[in-house]
Amino acid sequence: MTELKAKGPRAPHVAGGPPSPEVGSPLLCRPAAGPFPGSQTSDTLPEVSAIPISLDGLLFPRPCQGQDPSDEKTQDQQSLSDVEGAYSRAEATRGAGGSSSSPPEKDSGLLDSVLDTLLAPSGPGQSQPSPPACEVTSSWCLFGPELPEDPPAAPATQRVLSPLMSRSGCKVGDSSGTAAAHKVLPRGLSPARQLLLPASESPHWSGAPVKPSPQAAAVEVEEEDGSESEESAGPLLKGKPRALGGAAAGGGAAAVPPGAAAGGVALVPKEDSRFSAPRVALVEQDAPMAPGRSPLATTVMDFIHVPILPLNHALLAARTRQLLEDESYDGGAGAASAFAPPRSSPCASSTPVAVGDFPDCAYPPDAEPKDDAYPLYSDFQPPALKIKEEEEGAEASARSPRSYLVAGANPAAFPDFPLGPPPPLPPRATPSRPGEAAVTAAPASASVSSASSSGSTLECILYKAEGAPPQQGPFAPPPCKAPGASGCLLPRDGLPSTSASAAAAGAAPALYPALGLNGLPQLGYQAAVLKEGLPQVYPPYLNYLRPDSEASQSPQYSFESLPQKICLICGDEASGCHYGVLTCGSCKVFFKRAMEGQHNYLCAGRNDCIVDKIRRKNCPACRLRKCCQAGMVLGGRKFKKFNKVRVVRALDAVALPQPVGVPNESQALSQRFTFSPGQDIQLIPPLINLLMSIEPDVIYAGHDNTKPDTSSSLLTSLNQLGERQLLSVVKWSKSLPGFRNLHIDDQITLIQYSWMSLMVFGLGWRSYKHVSGQMLYFAPDLILNEQRMKESSFYSLCLTMWQIPQEFVKLQVSQEEFLCMKVLLLLNTIPLEGLRSQTQFEEMRSSYIRELIKAIGLRQKGVVSSSQRFYQLTKLLDNLHDLVKQLHLYCLNTFIQSRALSVEFPEMMSEVIAAQLPKILAGMVKPLLFHKK
């Protein structure tokens, strides 16, 4: 058999030698001369105790019986770099070592046990044991006895291990640090925990007297009892269990025959000797397994040739392995798979592990986490969670359809990692065993990552990362995050546990200003919007939003879609208030020339051309119409000269306050306003004028009218249009006065419950204004007449939607009434349990009901006629609930059968449908009706 070559004067291992039972202290004695290990009394059991974190006396061998005490003192004074020389001198002084050893010293004995546990090679193919340092004929090593190899597999194994062990610059017995997690660890404190505990009874020098440790004795007795219990029951396991601490079962000499293990478990040969079959598993038969102990930690992995690491790096490797195997680490199997070894490695095929002892092993059981909790792990940083990759793994079916990436360290996932000066934490119960803190912290971290309803996309659109927030007021939009933040784990809708989980994880208070309609403090924001310096991320819908820096700087409230210096006609930068409306100089001159020249402009299209900064000169007819709709009149500059002008104030004492950036009563005029010097003038209320200014522009469906209509193409085009309209609804709601004062969950919930009502209501208004209710005006490029409705597969649904424009024609609804009714539709459905900001919601809804009454009063004179009109309009709003319910049912059925029908649903729309439509159809929402049925 090929012998392994040793470096320098060291002799190779003796092939076929018996395995040594001295697992805990491989450097301190020589193997027995006979086929069986020598006897060892229980009073020579090595101590397992905490040692100080220092290099003095850690890597030095225990003197043999024939060694001179002066040599021991000389060895204690050596540095870490002279370890090899120390072992050379130890070889020269051997002679009477025998099979027994002197009582171990505390520091070196524990180190031997720890290093044997952490650095033992896992190659099952080694058939020769590793003799201790006292043996002249073998080279020193830091490992325990090797696993026995069956005779047929020995040559193949030696062929594999020989080039690895003889590689240049490496020592015999080198092992990978990652194999540390696969060794059988003693019950109780892990080696990493023991090293980090303060050494109250262990001196810093190796020559100090030894004090017995009752804890270590208890641990070893427990292991011995466990080994005896394993003899009676249990299947045959591959490999052999390790005798912990070098003690045999029962405390006496253990005769280990070649075919049996020390614990009574017979050895089973491997299936394959060429490392192609599954590896021999070294399993400790514990029934039941102690909680906090990983079953994967008992599995032997392949031999990986890595040079011997220093102590801190070895612990780092073992701790990293525990981190990757710990299920309490937020990410579970998905997070472990993201950092798992290659598929060829036996670790890749290992079973999932139980909760390990990772989070608590860095602290004493009676201490709180400190800033220097990781002094031995150099620049160790916890890897970032990749939630989206986790969702694509084995747990994707148990989680939400979609989740978003969190870059960087997440305090909700790493509750015990101090990130800067931590806030005061609640008193933590002392864990009774390693891994208990990880178990208790798992629900807190899981609540954030599993908050997977569809509200995150809407929340990302509602709140965008900005610079310094503007001056806040009662209706000011709250800033989403502090400057410098880079990403955000956004919580999903309807999970009140999110804030609690972040508080339990020790996260800093969230950034959400205390806003209220009447100065009342606003409810706390979700814990997802984190402090400055923590990650935040948003999906690609942000280009639809306007930054908060462009918002109005009003001391009362500001609106992101109505900056103070934006032209209300084309969107260019406004130069002032011209002819009663805030416009740019170009639109001012155009309106003056068009009105004074009395031009008869005609639109070449359908009177719905887009008027913006680039295309404002394309169609003068549509531009002039938009000027008139905004309230521009030539006599607007001469209002102060008329004595009989009576201004109707828009808001009473209980209504919403007026912003500074909104034109006042003497500036905003009604559409197509004409007057004479002796005529009373009534002006549009400022809030109504504001609702006109934030009304979304025309949205196109992108439908190809050159191709024949098919059911799938029409439905796909409608879904694309619905996605764009949903984004438009979110942007519109951000600019709505009072809406941003509601809790973020309430905002998302209201949009999700009312988006279908808002879309069909807008469809009815466009059909009423553009085609007089004769067709369904979905978009300028998607207009369905009755013939196209009949050819589609949803003709009955089209007839249902057609009722709305017909009601508009019957009632002759004005634009002011439509705008107020549209806001009330946003506020007409709430959850059964109510909203978090229920008081602010009710005040906001009451304010817009009053605005609807004022809009009715602009056309209806008298109390009776106004009351009748109010009844008709509110009755129409109540009837929309039943109509929209039919649309919800059809939409959900189409979404479920989308693959069979070849219909595409966009991402954001799919999330809202999957998350909220089942709730609405199941009656889990409360419609707000004006009249009893």
Curated annotation (Swiss-Prot):
Residues 220-231 have a biased composition (Acidic residues). A motif (Nuclear localization signal) lies at residues 183-187. Changing S294D: Decreases protein stability and increases progesterone-induced transcriptional activity. GO terms for molecular function: ATPase binding; DNA binding; DNA-binding transcription activator activity, RNA polymerase II-specific; DNA-binding transcription factor activity, RNA polymerase II-specific; enzyme binding; estrogen response element binding; identical protein binding; nuclear receptor activity. The steroid hormones and their receptors are involved in the regulation of eukaryotic gene expression and affect cellular proliferation and differentiation in target tissues. Depending on the isoform, progesterone receptor functions as a transcriptional activator or repressor. Residues 567-639 bind DNA. This is Progesterone receptor. Changing W140 to A/F/R: Reduces transcriptional activation. Residues 232-241, 335-350, 430-452 have a biased composition (Low complexity). A zinc finger (NR C4-type) spans 567-587, 603-627. The gene is PGR. Residues 1-157, 195-241, 331-351, 415-452 are annotated as: Disordered. Residues 165-305 are annotated as: Mediates transcriptional transrepression (in isoform A). Residues 1-164 are annotated as: AF3. The modification Phosphoserine is found at S20, S81, S102, S130, S162, S190, S213, S294, S345, S400, S676. Gene3D superfamilies: Erythroid Transcription Factor GATA-1, subunit A, Retinoid X Receptor. Pfam families: Hormone_recep, Prog_receptor, zf-C4.
